[in-house]
Amino acid sequence: RKENPLPAVCGRICNRRCEFECTRGDIDQPLAIDEIKKFIADQELDPATRFIPQKMHDYGKKIAVIGSGPAGLSCAYYLALDGYNVTVFEKENRLGGMLTLGIPSFRLEKNVIEAEIDILKEMGVMFKTGVEVGKDVTVPELRTEGFEAFYIAIGAQGGRKLGVEGEDAQGVISGVDFLRK
């Protein structure tokens, strides 16, 4: 977790480019580094044995992270680890951003994302879902609640167009919209 706050997620969605360059493949086969990382990270997801990092300091300062995708979760992890009181605001009712809404479960199981988020919760990170900053609550309002800094990690939730004939036809939706439903 020192270099990667979401190791179980990365162990599942990594495209394994390093394996194609692994010199071990010159002898027999490359190291299956993604499977190794996945195995190690899975051991840490077990609530009975997982390691919860301790805060290095206790600054007592509140920071708002806007968005709970990988950037927001990573930011929340490192800020909490350093000793800040972090609250993550997510406009959707589910945490994880595109990890949850944009990656199918056969590729990244939802319970893995939830377990990674549970570690953040045990580190003291607070989460507020169904709250769109700028609409449901404003930055000035958050400042009056004591938040001194803001990290905006709203991501890129939209699907991409392919540039093919018929993609604007009625009933055609993006892959992201399909996964959300």
Residue ranges, per PLM feature:
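Iron-sulfur (Fe-S) cluster-binding segments and ferredoxin-like electron-carrier domains
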Residues: R16-D42
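Glycine-rich FAD pyrophosphate-binding loop
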Residues: Y84-T100
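Short hydrophobic core segments
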Residues: I66, F89, F147-G155
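Glycine-rich dinucleotide-binding loop and its adjacent helix/turn
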Residues: I40-H57, A115-K135, G159-K181
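N-terminal Rossmann-like FAD-binding beta1-loop-alpha1 element of flavoenzymes
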Residues: K61-T87
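N-terminal Rossmann-like dinucleotide/flavin-binding domain of flavoprotein oxidoreductases
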Residues: R1-N4, R17, I36, L99-F147
